[in-house]
Amino acid sequence: MIQVLHGLGEHAGRYERFATACNAERIAVVAHNHRGHGHVEEFGHYADHDGWANVIADVLQVRQHIADRFPKVPVVLLGHSMGSYIAQSFVMRHGGNNHALILSASTYAPRGQLRAGHLCAQLLTALTGGQRVNSFLNHSGLGKFNERFKPARTKFDWLSRDEAEVDRYIQDPLCGGDFSNKLWADLTGGLLEITSRDAAATVRQDLPILILGGERDPVGGTIGLTLLADVYRKTGHDDVTLKLYPEGRHEMLNETNRDAVTRDVIEWIQNKMGSA
């Protein structure tokens, strides 16, 4: 079984096509919407207090539900983008409950940048309110990703080379949007947690890890994904697979070569878990 953790500004329903392909190979998929995502009153906001801890607690609650219903089924945790950071935080806290880890469109962010962003978000939360939206924070967090694809057809060209997929994202009322000061404070705080000294060493060393993404993904790309893989390898994890896709952008499961990417993920899981 795969437990999917979606990215920032999207929702679990976007993984239906991936789930259908997995189901055809007898692999079940479970996904939930993170706080502040999907059909919620407070879109773009985790919580007024302890947002990151609550997000991780939600993942654990879903995992416990899976364990209660399917106690003998191994679970692979797949996190995309923001979900990959949540996934890492989860396995650092609850490593024994995971049979494999897949990190899609992730990165190993520079801590200096993270500290600056975290401080800015904390200050804005204190001065103007945690639920308020600040255009500077949102532009700093997401607005620059499209710059390398100029002249761009849309402001979301960085997501995929497939124009139909980009348009589908734009037309989805549950995608995009702006995010609160407190969410940015929580998210950058979570990133500081998972990139802290020896954090990767707290992940169970025998955990199989697949790190995948597009070489042109502005979030991590070749450099960020390679650095992330190196961090885990240097902390004693000897079952780390790095898969980079030439010309690929941020959402490899929605890219022009998505069928091949999906097949790679399924085959990796079957190899690690067994096809039965």
Regions found by a protein language model. Give the residues of each.
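Conserved alpha/beta-hydrolase
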Residues: 14, 19-43
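Alpha/beta-hydrolase fold nucleophile elbow
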Residues: 69-81
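Alpha/beta-hydrolase-fold enzymes
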Residues: 87-174
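Short beta-strand/loop motif that positions the catalytic acidic residue
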Residues: 211-213
